[in-house]
Amino acid sequence: MKKFNTEEKIILAIDGLDIFQAKVLLERCPNIKWVKVGLELFTREGPSVIKILKNLNKKIFLDLKFHDIPNTMSAACYEVSKLGVDIISVHASAGSKALTASKKASLEGAKIATVNAPCVIGITVLTSLSSEEFQTDLDRKNSIEENVIRLAKLSFDAGLDGCVCSPLEAKILRSMYKNNFELITPGIRTNIQKKDDQNRIMTPFEAISNGSSKLVIGRAITKAKDPNKAFLDICESIC
């Protein structure tokens, strides 16, 4: 696999940083192509953070996980699509009507703003949830894997471009959907013993081998003594 392709597979999560810290980090790591902006950073900095990152020539996964009624979700997708982001996330559990409306609105918003339309991906089951929490806290009778499969199918049938799943479910989903259906996976750890706030985890190599399209990685890079080396080492590990 070419190095360029491996760099395209890593999305750096910068939510724990302010925009100044993020800029310094990205200047130290010129090979990073993708960044993830989540609720924490977007709430702190506002939409201006997108413009700043785009000026640094970064591709942006805006991970706000919209989950509401169809009209509200589609309106939100319309607005963020005008920012020129590359990927946006919505909760698949919002239902097929909301998903279809969100995808349509993202196309309309991008067209109005004359920017490329973003990929819209469905959140399946959060990787922070363990099997026990999923069944007790959420009162679910089926397994996490069964629910991920169901929500991935809902996303696919609604015309979304992919889904977010843990690396544990990536293998079975990749057997069901071709490579043009994105499987974006958090829960990636270079040190498999260090879970932090995730439960369903794998190493970068294991996740890519299972069929993940892109890996969301934060602390392993942002908290490394040498973030650029940490990023390049991860790229090398998935060759």
Swiss-Prot record:
Q: What class of enzyme is it?
A: lyase
Name assigned to this protein: Orotidine 5'-phosphate decarboxylase
Q: What does this protein do?
A: Catalyzes the decarboxylation of orotidine 5'-monophosphate (OMP) to uridine 5'-monophosphate (UMP).
Q: Which domain of life is it from?
A: Bacteria
Query: Which reaction is the catalytic activity of this chain?
Result: orotidine 5'-phosphate + H(+) = UMP + CO2
State how it assembles: Homodimer.
* Record's keyword terms, sorted: Decarboxylase, Lyase, Pyrimidine biosynthesis
Pfam families referenced in this protein's UniProt entry, alphabetically: OMPdecase
What the record says about family reads:
Belongs to the OMP decarboxylase family. Type 1 subfamily.
Annotated InterPro entries: Aldolase_TIM, OMPdecase, OMPdecase_AS, OMPdecase_bac, OMPdeCOase_dom, RibuloseP-bd_barrel
A GO term (biological process) for this protein?
'de novo' UMP biosynthetic process
Tell me the active site. Answer: K65 (proton donor)
Positions binding substrate in this chain are: 15, 36, 63-72, 127, 189, 198, 218-219
Q: Which Enzyme Commission numbers does its entry carry?
A: 4.1.1.23
Citing just one GO molecular function, the answer is: orotidine-5'-phosphate decarboxylase activity
**Pathway listed:** Pyrimidine metabolism; UMP biosynthesis via de novo pathway; UMP from orotate: step 2/2
**A single GO CC term, please?**
cytosol
